[in-house]
């Protein structure tokens, strides 16, 4: 087993990823509020935490991955009105779109994808307990969390509580005892509502994740809690506060946050009208290009998207996949090597150790390129050592798999192999017109 260390926003230190008493490692990532298609900022955590999950598994961890759907929200109500469909129809539509996005980006399905609407009874019971224990209070059918009861408040975002109060007063609510107190239950007559001891209404966003973690983990606790940097405050801070109130311990051992997205060196925002939907980028460039860009930058650093970044990614991917495809083809049409193949354990171990050091994907990619250099040298030999070539190809495929990238392992049919041999014969016999036509067909079939 290779121990994995990750940067914890709470302690500002690299911490070793642990396990519970059953040797399980729980990873929870805040999922989308499903009222629209995901933009590229929403897609970054999808890819980052998929790479983390693959890394943990490869390093010997038994990972339980949970990522929720927020299918109750004011934005959902407004979007449903705009599209003139029910809230259920709207959320179903965008959950389906998100699942397609996950597939297009080669992201593994979570072990659990809980929805808020499926956990309403548990959410109400959770809030009841907080009210009973004086961690929450009721005002005119609304329920608020009493932040003053949590001495650790501000520890995830590393903010001073007095400074937070000053900022919170800008949007002060006269119902609250404290400007920092946040909504656990909202009384409303708009949109879908649920009966509760306090009013007809719906839950606050910050409560939903805590309850879903409580429902799916043994002790309302995960080893890693992930999300975008923008969720540190108030969302993750408020989740943590409720965990202290409910079970008297932190919600997570490690709070892991990925960096934000810039478009042409400007922050992506609705006001600048520079939002880019992930599905549109995939339609233009493909999911593999997006994953390469994400893997080329450390997960905590911001990523700048521009035409130059995409062009560089395409160029680098050509350097990766052209020799791999050549190797795969030669192994099948010119050798008798059988699958599955062995790998270079030493090189693969170095690759995993790079990722185990706070998901250092840049270093991991440099190790991938070292193996590609070896593969290229083998391809250029007058007499190819097919065992060495096969081992190198398989090692690269293993590395690409951990990065969530496409592997090169197509098995060609006898008919396809014969077409390749026919193309070579045309070239040898200087039948260039026929060779050119057949080459186009081989490219179309993905053989060349």
PLM features per residue range, with description:
Residues 61, 135, 447:
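Short phosphate-binding/catalytic loops that engage adenosine nucleotides
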Residues 11-16, 20-106:
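N-terminal, positively charged nucleic-acid-binding surface of large information/translation enzymes
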Residues 81-86, 111-117, 199, 228:
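The substrate-binding groove and active-site-proximal loops of carbohydrate-active enzymes
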Residues 57, 103, 131-132, 256, ...:
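Alpha-helix C-terminal capping/helix-coil junction sites
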